[in-house]
A protein has these predicted regions:
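Conserved catalytic cysteine-centered active-site region
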Residues: 1-114, 143-168, 251-280
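Conserved small-residue
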Residues: 88, 108, 115, 144, ...
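Flexible, low-complexity linker/loop segments at domain and module junctions
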Residues: 191, 226, 230-232, 311-349
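Acyl-CoA/ACP chain-elongation machinery
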Residues: 123-147, 151-164, 198-212, 238-247, ...
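Stable alpha-helical structural segments in soluble proteins, enriched in small hydrophobic residues
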Residues: 111, 218-229, 256, 281, ...
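Condensing-enzyme catalytic core mediating Claisen C-C bond formation in acyl metabolism
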Residues: 154-228, 232-235, 348-349
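Glycine-/small-residue-rich "gating" segment that lines the acyl/pantetheine channel
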Residues: 113, 117, 134-185, 317-323
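Short beta-strand-to-turn element immediately C-terminal to the catalytic PLP-Schiff-base lysine
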Residues: 150, 175-179, 254, 342-347
Length: 349
């Protein structure tokens, strides 16, 4: 630290006496002073390229290295959150708003609610929704490791087991949702299930650890919006990250739904997408339930955590299971305490 202090003081003192620096700054100011010509459209590209060339020549003349800000690739702008939505709008020539709601693991449910609200309010007939996560970045994995919520033994992370932690994954999920009557009028047929209700709320309690009150309130809100009684829910897909939060979430589900509701979880199969996980999991639920089946968690009885083992019969553990009923539900709980709950049912013939 002391060396850095002395170095900065040395440079600050001598830079005032550098005639070359003053000459460099005068020439740089002249380069940057050039504005766009009278015809903006035809001039702007030429001016940008001319300035870039002049700066490179100026640096070479004075032996000056490239400035740090000139070493940054402009393609970094594609990391702005709404860029995937913008790209889809360009590919599909979609002129509606392109936004990127940020709700961590509850991101897909949040985007779904925004789309349904827009459709029900008459602001849209169709919406393209989705989430995308990059491949796991060392900073993301490292922060999860430091928070003690990532699996560290090299084995597949399974919900409801030893609470060893989750594992981070990347990918994307995109849906097209819309007014059913309108799309049927265009000759389209629906996939999956009909969305009856979506609710989102916040625990307002802890960044990582979920509460009981927040998710339970979210479930009740979704049931009310969907006009569905808990007894009607044939299956419930859980967030279940293979962390101690699984126990809290299981208690939440058992406090609302009857023992006949079949419980599933998907992160052992898909991994834990930071925003997209809800999309993957909801897609799996919809595509299976629409065919009358539930895909298993892939759990043997002796793998289930001892404290949860007495509730193991409620889990779809290791075999494909046929299911009766018409209503399915899904829960996601995101970092920051944000919850999203989706209630769906089979389409009417």
């Amino acid at each position: 630290d002391r060396f850095d202090e002395v170095s900065e003081a040395w440079y600050e003192f001598w830079v005032r006496y550098s005639s070359s620096l003053q000459d460099y700054l005068v020439e740089l100011r002249e380069i940057e002073a050039e504005g766009v010509g009278e015809d903006i459209e035809t001039s702007k590209g030429h001016v940008i390229r001319r300035k870039a060339t002049a700066r490179r020549k100026l640096n070479a003349k004075y032996g000056c290295p490239s400035e740090p800000w000139n070493a940054v690739d402009a393609s970094l702008l594609w990391n702005i959150p709404n860029m995937p939505a913008a790209q889809i709008s360009m590919l599909g020539k979609i002129t509606g708003p392109t936004v990127a709601p940020m709700a961590a693991c509850s991101g897909f449910g949040t985007t779904l609610k925004l789309a349904i609200d827009a459709i029900q309010c008459g602001e849209a007939k169709v919406a393209v929704i989705g989430n995308t996560d990059p491949e796991p970045h060392p900073l993301t994995v490292g922060s999860f490791f430091s928070a003690r919520v990532v699996s560290q033994d090299g084995q597949v992370s399974k919900p409801f087991t030893g609470m060893r932690g989750t594992h981070v994954s990347g990918g994307a999920c995109i849906w097209i949702v819309g007014d059913a009557a309108y799309l049927r009028g265009l000759g389209m047929k629906p996939l999956g299930l009909e969305i009856l209700g979506v609710s989102i709320n916040s625990d307002a309690d802890h960044i990582i650890t979920p509460t009981q009150k927040g998710p339970r309130a979210c479930i009740q809100q979704a049931l009310e919006v969907a006009n569905v009684a808990p007894e009607e829910v044939a299956t419930w897909d859980m967030h279940a990250t293979a962390t101690p939060g699984d126990w809290t979430e299981l208690q939440n589900a058992l406090s609302v739904f009857p023992g006949t509701t079949r419980l599933t979880a998907r992160k052992g199969a898909f991994g834990h997408g930071m925003s997209v996980c809800g999309g993957w999991e909801l897609t799996a639920q919809h595509m299976g339930f629409a065919k009358g089946v539930l895909h298993p968690v892939d759990l043997e009885e002796d793998e289930i955590h001892p404290q949860m083992r007495e509730y193991g019969e409620s889990l779809v553990r290791h075999e494909l299971e046929e299911i009766e009923g018409r209503v399915a539900g899904k829960m996601n709980m995101g970092i920051g305490g944000v919850n999203a709950c989706v209630i769906s049912r089979l389409w009417e013939d």
